[in-house]
Amino acid sequence: MTQKLHIKTWGCQMNEYDSAKIADLLLSTHGLELTEEAEQADVLLLNTCSIREKAQEKVFSQLGRWKTWKNEKPGLIIGVGGCVASQEGEHIRERAPFVDIIFGPQTLHRLPEMINQIRGGKSSVVDVSFPEIEKFDCLPEPKAEGPTAFVSIMEGCNKYCTYCVVPYTRGEEVSRPLDDVLFEVAQLADQGVREINLLGQNVNAYRGPTHDGGICTFAELLRLVASIDGIDRLRFTTSHPIEFTDDIIDVYADTPELVSFLHLPVQSGADRILTMMKRGHTALEYKSIIRKLRKVRPDIQISSDFIVGFPGETNEEFEQTMNLIADVNFDMSFSFVYSARPGTPAADMPDDVSEEEKKQRLYLLQQRINNQAAKFSRAMLGTEQRVLVEGPSKKDIMELTGRTENNRIVNFKGTPDMIGKFVDIQITDVFTNSLRGDVIRTEDEMGLRVEQSPQSVIRRTRKEDELGVGKYVA
């Protein structure tokens, strides 16, 4: 009887990417088939996030629900991974001794051996070490699931913002070798992927070693990925302003595959708060980056992250953030009230903004950005938008749905052969959470750039053993 795997994932896109890799890995090594029904699983994994408030308690609450199944099914294996696992380590076992495996973001590739050890009679396995980039060498080939895909190009962060736990839970910055990244992208392109989203905690700090001993910058990587045939839309997340160099802006000027949409976290519009956060830039320097971008891409839309109620934030400083939001004209945001993360420098600062004040500021901030986003959507009425078709519409299976460069959902009448391809749509209606339109051009009429085939990239970047035989991680 086929055994089942259930993974519950919290947090960022990096965690989503890691969970997908875990599922592929354990299917190839142990034949574990992924299930959405946790009760059916033989292996239960919790991939955690430590960014949000009370992250640890959320983990133990979930584990408490799983404990009853462990009592009923003694052979059930329970594992905890992700950033909370990295942060808490053995403490998880102290509070929840029924947990079999504790693994960090950098040791997920060792899960097959950990499972073997538990099945071999070992009571528990804990490995939350930081073996740099080793995990990418031990994961199976990527499998495309639709026309879009994420590709992790680096891990960790060296910025040590005072409120953030990432450097402590995912380690410092380590970039994947250039050929490894291109090989994965080419494999996905060969399977029909049309949009790639490059991932990293500080993605634009990428400095990947090349086969000849050099270093590939993030700007160079963007151009190389965009040159692979079939990859006609390119995104990246999450970037840091102090790494957003002019050579990256130059890519926006000459690489049409790079979308006119950027997520660039700023956190606050007040310089004193930015200094206390150890962000390394001022509000004016942030706006300077946006001005340069809009000079080469006048239509680019910007989203950001904001923390309101950081220790010591005054009403005047919050207004500076609101002014920045208006000046930049952000399209959307991920915004949160400040809550201290244990072990970070900011946790030692007096948290002197009341919860009521934090919530009020958050409401005002989100209301302003929502209003700005609505104006952007209304301005799209009557315009022509390029849409990547993802599949049937959730609202009407007789229609198709896709996304624009600026992440708007568009529903329209089309044919099944359009799925996984681009179409140009004339926007005819604007709704709160979606747009409607009519097809005016199919992909065959677009003349998309053709430069190098995925197969040629695969041949050039595949790894070989000492006999010159190609090696593929299976």
UniProtKB/Swiss-Prot annotation:
This chain is encoded by the gene named miaB
Q: Please state every residue range assigned to the domain named MTTase N-terminal.
A: 3-120
What are the required cofactors? [4Fe-4S] cluster
What is the protein's name according to its record? Answer: tRNA-2-methylthio-N(6)-dimethylallyladenosine synthase
> Which ranges form a coiled coil?
none
Q: Does the keyword Endoplasmic reticulum apply?
A: no
One of the Pfam families matching this protein, by short name: UPF0004
- The residues listed in the UniProt record as binding [4Fe-4S] cluster 1, with positions renumbered to this chain, are 12, 49, 83
Give the keywords, sorted: 4Fe-4S, Cytoplasm, Iron, Iron-sulfur, Metal-binding, S-adenosyl-L-methionine, Transferase, tRNA processing
Family designation? Belongs to the methylthiotransferase family. MiaB subfamily.
Q: Please report the stretch or stretches of sequence annotated as the TRAM domain.
A: 378-441
So where does [4Fe-4S] cluster 2 get bound?
157, 161, 164
